[in-house]
Amino acid sequence: MRVGVLAVQGAFIEHEKILQNLGVECLELRNGKDARQDVEGLILPGGESTTQGKLLRELDMFEPLREKIVAGLPVLATCAGLILLAEELANDSARYFATLPVRVKRNAYGRQLGSFYTEEQFGDLGKVPMTFIRAPYIESVGEDVEILAKVNGDIVGVRYKNQIGLSFHPELNGDRRIHQMFLDSISGGKSFPCTQKAV
């Protein structure tokens, strides 16, 4: 199995380490040629979403990656990656891939709670460690979006077809369960193409 990891900015190395520990080949996606390579899954890491979005377009990566996501490529998106997937941003007119029918608020916890750690229920996995760093949260979800996790009533994890979007960083705590769940969704072989309007 080969998974592409967006590697233009942000916390991609930590994702790669977990995937490699799980026996998965990683392909760092750094340019348009990389973005057109065949991969069985995609990770959009945390970082700075505005910078990532700008680089995706400048490096000719945006359209090929969006086409793959729309066609049903499994995606795990964390923090800034969630912002890239969101159809709508509550406090920003920008849109990026816009394939995940959720409304996301950037830097939702403000400065005082900009970074924090907790352990909360995540789907069927039980309690998992969650590290939030200037994190967004999901204000609302569209039809058929499964809510996987909440913290203090705020939605911080969702699944829609082949897309998993998280407000937090599962790669920072040494817990592999969320990545394993993502890989299981790939090996399950189900593909759910999106019916999303073009950006």
Curated annotation (Swiss-Prot):
Q: Which GO terms describe its biological process?
A: glutamine catabolic process; pyridoxal phosphate biosynthetic process; pyridoxine metabolic process
By its UniProt entry, which SUPFAM superfamilies does this protein fall under? Class I glutamine amidotransferase-like
Annotated Gene Ontology cellular component terms: cytosol; glutaminase complex
UniProt superkingdom: Bacteria
Pathway listed: Cofactor biosynthesis; pyridoxal 5'-phosphate biosynthesis
Give all cystine bridges in this chain: none
Function in brief: Catalyzes the hydrolysis of glutamine to glutamate and ammonia as part of the biosynthesis of pyridoxal 5'-phosphate. The resulting ammonia molecule is channeled to the active site of PdxS.
Family named by the database record: Belongs to the glutaminase PdxT/SNO family.
Supply the name of the protein.
Pyridoxal 5'-phosphate synthase subunit PdxT
